[in-house]
Amino acid sequence: MSVNKKYKCRLCKECNGKACIGELPGMGGVFESANFILNCAEWKNYYTSDSYPLPRLRLAPMTGAVENVGYEDERQFYFDLIRASVKAGLALSIGDGYPDLKLFSGIEALRDVKKKGAVFLKPYPQMKLFERIEASMESAEIIGVDTDAYNIVTMRNLVHLEKKSAKDLAALKKYAKLPFAVKGIFTSYDIEVVKELKPDIAIISNHGGRIETDRGSVAAFAHSHLKEIKKYSGEVWADGGLRKREDFMAASSLGVEEVLIGRPCITALLRDKENGIKNFIDSILGKDLTKEACGSLGSSPLRSFEKP
């Protein structure tokens, strides 16, 4: 574990977006963290009861440990994060970024724990994405594309990213030969892409409020559009502002089958090191429910991804 004492996360008791407003690079978001704050605040609007099944829980893909978190060593971050997530029983994800060290360190971290995970790639030009899919295959149980990241502020002017069409994504899906996820469903354009592509997994997300997109929360978008999205995808997942059991239940009530957890896992890792993420998940669910909610595609009895 190698953590810079001057990390950028404030270690808030509850991560709600209000202590790091507008900090980007950093832990905040665009529009003075407006969508980040809304993501955290609005799941409660859709909580009705505990009678729904818990959605599965997965670590969200996160990179940029040095510039965004203040971690001392970029590569080590992925090993520490993945190991702590395995200890917590979470299904795994890794992300992509610039430089390529970010993706390839994530792949190494999965190999280190002898696990597979969801690999979420940035929307690079097609040929580069084919190469990245190939490099990820041995460690991937799911291949995904962060389609909304073409407009991400932290990579602007550093690399060429593209707004992907359904045709572009269909070529990647065919090449991957694995369950294929589209992450970043948050606009009417995104819904049309899902309708044409029919992905195995559609992930409602506004990138944690870190990209310039429509204003609003993941919860409100799911409430308005999940049923329509579900008609054209195998599963619908959610990513954004999910912090506690009631949030998970609200997501489940809307039809979400799996949720991604991001910033709170970083906070937990920084606070309690290798035990942090387990302590965090156990504190909000309890050990028995943690076992129910956590699991990876390769080890839990998930439904097969039927073609819509």
PLM regions: where:
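Generic structural signal for short, solvent-exposed loop/turn connectors between secondary structure elements
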Residues: 18-58, 113-117, 126-127, 134-142, ...
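Well-ordered, non-membrane alpha-helical segments in soluble/globular domains
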Residues: 73-79, 102-108, 129-133, 165-167, ...
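Alpha/beta enzyme core
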Residues: 83, 125-238, 245-267, 300-305
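N-terminal capping/small domains of soluble enzymes
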Residues: 1-125, 305
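Short polybasic/polar patches that bind polyanions
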Residues: 86, 174, 295
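Short low-complexity, flexible loop/linker segments enriched in glycine and/or proline
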Residues: 107-115, 159-160, 197-198, 217-220, ...
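Alpha/beta catalytic cores of nucleotide-metabolism and tRNA/nucleoside-modifying enzymes
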Residues: 1-39, 219-308
